Amino acid sequence: MCYQTSKKKRRSRKRRAQEEKEKMGKGVVSEKVKLVVALITLQFCFAGFHIVSRVALNIGVSKVVYPVYRNLLALLLIGPFAYFFEKKERPPLTISLLAQFFFLALIGITANQGFYLLGLYYATPTFASAMQNSVPAITFIMACALRLEHIDLVRKHGVAKVLGTLVSIGGATVITLYRGFPIFDQGLNMQKEEVVGSDNSHSLTLGWLYLMGHCLSWAGWMVLQAPVLKQYPAKLTLTSFTCFFGLIQFLVIALFVETDLNNWIIVSWEELFTILYAGIIASGLVVYLQTWCIYKSGPVFVAVFQPLQTLLVAAMAFLILGDQLYSGGIVGAVFIMLGLYLVLWGKNEERKLALEESQQDPESLTKHLLEAQHKKSNSESEV
């Protein structure tokens, strides 16, 4: 009777353990799906921002007024949510934290957005997006230097992450450097204003320099944001402070650069749309999504989705700006998808390994050894 009861208990415990394992597995899959969907959405929003920003420059929106309105809208959008939703989880503010927020805004808002607009003025959206594909490599180097990312080249998952990053960057580079033959006729060309900037080599060099500054500041912002989030995990509040300090910094610049009050007046629906998109989507939704993704997966995993954006920008530029689509874009897209698959596989294997290692609890192992030793001593005493 006692034997049957203990057997039933063992079966019950085994069943409960199996159910908990299944629930945990479903939760992990759900988190992965949410993360991947968020990152893909992020790239769609960024791709749209490339096109919208180019339209804004074409119709004459000031390169200083544009980011001021953008960050003001983002602050007005995110600030109330941060105040009401993060009251309980918001840690107390310190001078050190405020200084870190100011520095993050200087890198991630002021330098990042300023260099981007200057670079886009001299280059095309596709070229600007392709330049941004250096961000994963820069982020990877910075994260490794600060010991925020560990790559084990002895194991398969480490090699897959490195190889996938390189393949993705290579695919995006192919889109830029190899044109190939045209696939479709000219796009819709919905934006008919004359394109600003110039196509000469001097202008392209300036565009390259400004966009490289943009990539360096963006990568630095993603890497430095990770340790700040550990100290201050209230993501909405952190985003609000970053937008606030970025707005202040751009206003100071505007006092010296943009003195003509006419440039601050919105005169067309096109200008209004570009500013609303930049503020609500690019600085509001996108910044929060990116902050959440960095918190969930780390800066390198977020940056590795960047090459997908170049494919989206090329398609949008074809449909909206009338840019021609070439076979090089298709070839590059294949490499991008292959690279993303390699990184996702490597990250998945790394998580599996970490989960297996965490299940080997040293305390339970010690307890098991002590019990075995106790049983051994009891048997010896009985003898």
Swiss-Prot record:
Give GO MF terms, alphabetically: transmembrane transporter activity
Residue ranges of the EamA domain? 44-173, 216-344
What is the protein's species of origin?
Arabidopsis thaliana (Mouse-ear cress)
Q: How does it sit in the membrane?
A: Multi-pass membrane protein
Q: Which family does it belong to?
A: Belongs to the drug/metabolite transporter (DMT) superfamily. Plant drug/metabolite exporter (P-DME) (TC 2.A.7.4) family.
Q: What InterPro entries would the database entry show? A: EamA_dom, WAT1-related
Protein's name according to its UniProt entry: WAT1-related protein At3g18200
**Keyword line:** Membrane, Repeat, Transmembrane, Transmembrane helix
Compartments where found? Membrane
S-adenosyl-L-methionine keyword on record = no
Q: Where are the transmembrane segments?
A: 33-53, 65-85, 91-111, 126-146, 158-178, 204-224, 237-257, 272-292, 300-320, 325-345
Region Disordered: what ranges? 1-23
Q: Which Pfam families match?
A: EamA
Q: Where is the composition biased (Basic residues)?
A: 1-16
Which cellular component, as a GO term, is one annotated location? membrane
